Amino acid sequence: MERACRWGMGPLGEIHWKGRWIGWDAAFAWDREDSHSRLSSRYLRTEFKTQAKEIKYATLHLCGLGMYELFINGQRIGDQVLAPAPSDYRRTVLYNSFDVTKQVAGGNADNAIGVTLGNGRFYTMRQNYKPYKIPTFGYPKLRLNLIIEYTDGSIQRINSDEKWRLTAQGPIRSNNEYDGEIYDARMELGNWTQPGYDDSKWLKAQRVSLPYGTLRGNTAPNMKVMKTLKPAVFKQYGDRYMIDFGQNMAGWVRINIAKAAAGDTICIRYAERVKNDGTELDVENLRHSQSTDYYICNGKENNTSWSSRFSYHGFQYVEVTGYKNLKAEDLVAEVVYDDLEDNGTFECSNDIMNRVYRNAWWGISSNYKGVPLDCPQRDERQPGLATMLWERGGKVSCSTMETPMPNGRMISVKRSVKTVVFLIFVRLITIIIHQK
């Protein structure tokens, strides 16, 4: 017998969106708004009590700009990362929907919702710097609807409004897609995503300006951690550790911190290549992208696992400083790209052709970040011409990507990543034959 599946509709326009846009429409005193913008993450929370009834379904819709992480009663919701996907915010902003029936506690129970907001490309990576090229769209903001349907047919709604509480005095002191993330564990907020937390010193969330774009459901695959890689080469040079993961990729490094003193600063620098002797990173091709993550220890680390949340890097090599007795098994590279299925493989007796195929596969995977990018590492990472046409509702027909999504945002990938790679591979063989 087949398992019964549930199907539902998202909000159909403004009439069904009860939540308000909330956040804080200004920088805080410690933030920087210049060519290397530094804006701390905003943390928002609310608590509510369910009715003394049995819950049938609970569905949550939210748009967190530029990026978000969602928690209910201390549990992170979903395995997506860097969500929602970027868009031309002047035309479209994307929301995600989640079935949270299992996470919401019924029967007159206390519940809590917590949302962390990152900057993404909404509050852009470079403020007051070439706005014609890298526009900014405002400060991070949230809109949320939680719809709880009880077995008796009644409905309870929890919406984002000015009753929510907000703080920017949390551990993510800065997040910037080009430059990386600064995380200060001394400023962690404890059980802020669980009911009963004392948020009396937090600010009241503001009702903030609306984004220009139309709010639409995200129908494309979310970005996820799709693979993990262990270090291929691990070497120490004085107080520096140089790690080669053996493959160029896009994502970040997750580090396990056994013990550390409060205030110790672990620095993780990323690069695609090293200098000739292999002892130093070569970051010249990154241009102004700093591609560095910082973790400031609180002294309570006990095999603490950490990675950045709202930035990613194109890299193969990593330099780690500020952490004594680092071991290779303390590090793992998490490879991030759109959740596209592999529907085939290629292998032949020619090693060069196999390598061409693998390189093409990795290149395409690294550049699928909600929209196809031109690169995942330097201070650009912009969509190509085709993507801009998709964003504007145009249609670009080619052998790999054919049809705009119904929301006019981007392509529907009819053929998955490995199919795209195969077509590129065939094209390369054709070129080689013609050259001969």
Question: Whereabouts are the PLM-identified features?
Answer:
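Well-ordered alpha-helical scaffold segments within catalytic/enzyme domains
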Residues: 390-400, 436
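HEAT/HEAT-like alpha-solenoid repeats
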Residues: 413-417
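Extracellular/oxidizing-compartment recognition motifs
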Residues: 2-378, 386, 401-412, 423-430
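Long, structured ligand/cofactor-binding scaffold of large enzymes
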Residues: 433
